[in-house]
């Protein structure tokens, strides 16, 4: 799969090697620093350090300069294999390396890499020598905190991030993209457009949607429900908590407890807030008996779930502790599986298209070594998923052994306006929960059979999808999603009566419109203000418009449409909303 870095690629090796060069530079400049780990990552590299003194962004230029000096030596990267005992002796003054070495078995191969005046515990691979790295093709980009081994109980280290490319041109292109990503950061735009907030004193990873953001969310959810009804789904509502016995039966307490919030003791029972909706949907299924004639059931829920994510992993609305999944479970018979999978795929493509996403990537994950379920069911399910992708002409990669232990899956990823991939839809077979909860239906031959269950999410989570939309559009939402679609700006109080007439007409037609009759701000200042708020249309009303009974429209991109009749202007906006146009 694409996010798995290609260890043999030249760029991977360069990024791994430059991380070692950075560590050497840091040790030369700050001699008492302790080193932890420094891997290559997507778009770059990082290294974690335990500094004696606090370092700042200003120190990065100094480190970069020292790195370039080291690169000029052209020193080779030389691999050596040593014993565990030798490794413990070699790194006796490096506590984080010692921690890693102690965790290795005595029989494990331990390799080190030497380069210039630096030696690191490392599996590689690396470039042959430093001459392979263009000294103008890298940049240190940021400093962050990172707990050792990702555990909040451990010491907070200093992580220095960098990026490296094959040449200076590629580096400049990446840095330009990075600036655009910063400009579109949903956390930044969330503040500027008054969309949402997070309150650390109330709880990290818990999202508060403000009126503007809540309006957009409501539009998304209303559209979601409407389309699900059209596609033969029933919508469910289930509780937010459940007794521990439910999570024991589902297996969550055995396999997922670390990601669950702590139990709550009430009425001599233990309760947990739900990390997933599946067991609740199964509980509804198991309230009665079902015949093959009843199948399939397509049950969907905008269900809020809670997962204990580490604080360091939280990120705006993208990675949170409480979020609303657009969850659905399809419960069907063997002979219905293929058509149901195909319909889910079609539905996913349609939904994305409505929100302005046309490019996608698909990944088919197959059976891992440890798995539950019948061998024939696995083979059939993988075949069905693959055939559905082929039938709909969806290109895909196969992730061999990448499926969950309980079933194969398709992961679908959209590509946003900045070329980034986002995991969105999942179509996942489950051979585990139907067995655990003893789900049955009466087949045509009168025998009790186990139904097939398909987990399915289209948007992933509402909060995360919201953040993706903000960044995809840079906050300039398509007209149908804009919290405020039209602002009326009268040039003076004389024309206010006509402005109120327009306001009433458009409001009655369901257009989200407001009147700004504040006399203390100049018109040009108002126009700039509403452009910065990314309101699609500004109706500028002067005495000429009153006399002629017309409207002049200015868009947020400064385009001008003059002299529209009232009904023409109304139809213009209505069509933009109906067709889900950007502007």
From Swiss-Prot:
Domain of life where this protein originates: Bacteria
Subcellular localization, as worded in the UniProt entry: Cytoplasm
Source species of the chain: Borrelia hermsii (strain HS1 / DAH)
One GO term describing the cellular component: cytoplasm
Entry function: Catalyzes the attachment of threonine to tRNA(Thr) in a two-step reaction: L-threonine is first activated by ATP to form Thr-AMP and then transferred to the acceptor end of tRNA(Thr). Also edits incorrectly charged L-seryl-tRNA(Thr).
One example GO MF annotation: metal ion binding
Name under which the protein is recorded: Threonine--tRNA ligase
Subunit structure: Homodimer.
Lineage of origin: Bacteria, Pseudomonadati, Spirochaetota, Spirochaetia, Spirochaetales
């Amino acid at each position: 799969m694409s996010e798995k870095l290609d260890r043999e690629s030249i760029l991977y090796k360069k990024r791994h090697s430059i991380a070692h060069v950075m560590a050497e530079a840091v040790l030369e400049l700050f001699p008492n620093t302790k080193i932890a780990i420094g891997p290559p990552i997507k778009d770059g590299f990082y290294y974690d350090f335990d500094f004696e003194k606090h370092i700042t962004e200003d120190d990065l230029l100094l480190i970069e300069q020292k790195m370039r000096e080291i690169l000029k030596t052209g020193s080779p990267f030389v691999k050596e294999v040593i014993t565990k005992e030798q490794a413990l002796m070699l790194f006796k003054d490096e506590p984080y390396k010692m921690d890693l070495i102690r965790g290795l078995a005595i029989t494990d191969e331990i390799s080190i890499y030497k380069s210039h005046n630096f030696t690191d515990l490392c599996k590689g691979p690396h470039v042959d020598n430093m001459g392979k790295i263009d000294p103008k093709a890298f940049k240190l980009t940021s400093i962050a905190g990172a707990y050792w081994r990702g555990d909040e109980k451990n010491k907070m280290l200093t992580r220095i991030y960098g990026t490296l490319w094959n040449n200076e041109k590629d580096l400049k292109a990446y840095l330009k993209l990075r600036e655009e990503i910063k400009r579109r950061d949903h956390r930044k735009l969330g503040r500027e457009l008054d969309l949402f907030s997070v309150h650390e004193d109330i709880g990290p990873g818990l999202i508060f949607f403000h009126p503007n953001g809540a309006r957009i969310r409501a539009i998304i959810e209303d559209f979601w429900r409407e389309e699900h009804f059209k596609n033969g789904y029933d919508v469910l509502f289930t509780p937010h908590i459940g007794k521990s016995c439910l999570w024991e039966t589902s297996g969550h307490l055995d396999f997922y407890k670390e990601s669950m919030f702590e139990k709550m003791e009430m009425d001599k029972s233990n309760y947990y807030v739900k990390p997933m909706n599946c067991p609740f949907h199964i509980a509804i299924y198991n309230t009665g008996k079902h015949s093959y004639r009843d199948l399939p059931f397509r049950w969907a829920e905008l269900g809020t779930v809670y997962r204990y994510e580490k604080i360091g992993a939280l990120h705006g609305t993208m990675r949170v502790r409480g979020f609303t999944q657009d969850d659905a479970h399809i419960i069907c018979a063997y002979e219905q599986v293929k058509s149901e999978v195909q319909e889910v795929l079609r539905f996913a493509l349609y939904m994305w298209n409505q929100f302005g996403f046309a490019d996608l990537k698909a990944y088919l994950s197959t059976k891992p070594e440890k798995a539950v379920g019948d061998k024939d069911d696995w083979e059939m399910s993988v075949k069905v998923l693959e055939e559905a992708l082929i039938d709909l002409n969806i290109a895909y990669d196969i992730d061999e052994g990448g499926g969950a232990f309980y079933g194969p899956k398709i992961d679908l990823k959209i590509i946003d306006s900045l070329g980034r991939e986002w995991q969105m839809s999942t179509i996942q077979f489950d051979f585990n929960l139907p067995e655990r909860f003893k789900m049955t239906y009466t087949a045509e031959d009168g025998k009790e059979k186990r139904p097939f269950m398909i987990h399915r999410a289209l948007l992933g989570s509402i909060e995360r999808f919201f953040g993706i939309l903000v960044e995809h559009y840079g906050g300039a939402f398509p007209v149908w999603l804009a919290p405020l679609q039209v602002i009326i700006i009268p040039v003076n109080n004389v024309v206010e009566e006509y402005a109120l007439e327009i306001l009433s007409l458009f409001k009655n037609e369901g257009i989200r419109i407001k009147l700004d009759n504040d006399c203390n701000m100049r018109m040009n200042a108002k126009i700039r203000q509403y452009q910065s708020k990314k309101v699609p249309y500004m109706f500028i009303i002067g005495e000429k418009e009153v006399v002629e009974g017309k409207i002049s429209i200015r868009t947020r991109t400064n385009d001008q449409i003059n002299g529209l009749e009232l009904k023409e202007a109304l139809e213009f906006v209505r069509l933009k909303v109906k067709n889900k146009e950007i502007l």
